[in-house]
Structures are given as C-alpha cells and as structure tokens.
C-alpha cells in the first residue's frame, strides 16, 4: 500500500512500533470505543494484537498528521457486500474530533477506492453517533438506508445503524 497525502495528513500503512500511540490516542479510550464494535483495549498488549491485524489486512490505514508520524486514528475496509461494494469504517482519537480530520481522511480513501476501480463506497454509523453521519455527508456521501448490527464483537446486543453511500 502506498501512502496517501492530503493537505494536513499522511494516511499510511501501519508499522511496527505504532501500538503505543494507537493505545494512547484511541484504542484505550472509552470515548472512542463507545461507538465502535470493538471493546476498549485494557493495555497496549491488546493493541499489539490489533496492530498485527492492521499490518496484515489488505486495506487498513493509520491516520497521521503530516508533522508527526504518530497514528491518531485508523480507517479500513470493514466489509464487502455481495455486489462487491466496499464498506469503510474508522476511528479517531478524541483529541482530534471536530477538526475535519476524519472528513479529510474519508474523502481521500473514497478517491483511492474509486481509483482502484470501485464504483460505489458505503459506510455506516450507530444512530447514537450522529457526528459520524455528518462526517459521511461532508465527504459527499448520502443517506441510503437503516439497518441493524451488533453493538460489540462477541455480543448479541443489537444497535440501529444508518448507512451512507457515494457513487463514482
């Protein structure tokens, strides 16, 4: 995977040594994991396992600021539907919320997926996290449907989701 450079960000593959910053910036923060399907990491060793997954995944990116090569969030393909439409998912450190960083990231990833030949991209958010829906809208996506999904991996608890899409 190549790096994707935007106005303020370097979106790059994960690398050895990223786990401490990941844990500090988002995986160890209840405020971030509250709306994600994964549980808050209790220590950096759990994040090391997640880092191994990220490094081996075909499409999982670290979000870093241009001037600091430290992951502040991540974005990846969390699924592909039966028609081959990719679904993106993301998480961003709490200290970076409300600054347009995730919108900038989502726009860049959508452009990359379109460049790779996809004609449509989807994303969803927990209905209790409307700020994530605003990120999708600001990135050019439009609401397409409601759905239901699991609240957390390994849990039977359900949560309502709103799906957004964008076409090439």
Where are these regions (language model features)?
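Conserved GNAT-fold acetyl-CoA-binding loop/helix
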Residues: 31-51
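A short helix-loop-beta-strand connector motif used in the catalytic cores of GNAT acetyltransferases and
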Residues: 51-62
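Acyl-donor (CoA/ACP) binding surface of acyl/acetyltransferases
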Residues: 1-21, 25-30, 34, 60, ...
């Amino acid at each position: 995977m190549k790096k994707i450079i935007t106005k303020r960000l370097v979106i790059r593959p994960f690398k050895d040594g990223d786990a401490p910053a990941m844990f500090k910036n988002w995986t160890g923060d209840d405020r971030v994991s509250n709306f994600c399907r994964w549980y808050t990491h209790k220590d950096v060793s759990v994040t090391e396992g997640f880092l191994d997954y990220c490094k081996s995944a075909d499409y999982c990116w670290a979000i870093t600021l241009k001037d600091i090569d430290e992951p502040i969030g991540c974005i990846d393909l969390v699924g592909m539907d039966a028609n081959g439409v990719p679904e993106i998912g993301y998480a961003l450190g709490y200290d970076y919320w409300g600054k347009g960083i995730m919108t900038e990231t989502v726009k860049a990833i959508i452009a990359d997926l379109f460049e790779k030949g996809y004609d449509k991209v989807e994303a969803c958010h927990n209905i209790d996290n409307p700020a994530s829906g605003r990120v999708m809208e600001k990135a050019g996506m439009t609401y397409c449907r409601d759905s239901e999904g699991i609240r957390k991996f390994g849990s039977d608890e359900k949560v309502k989701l709103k799906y957004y899409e964008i076409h090439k």
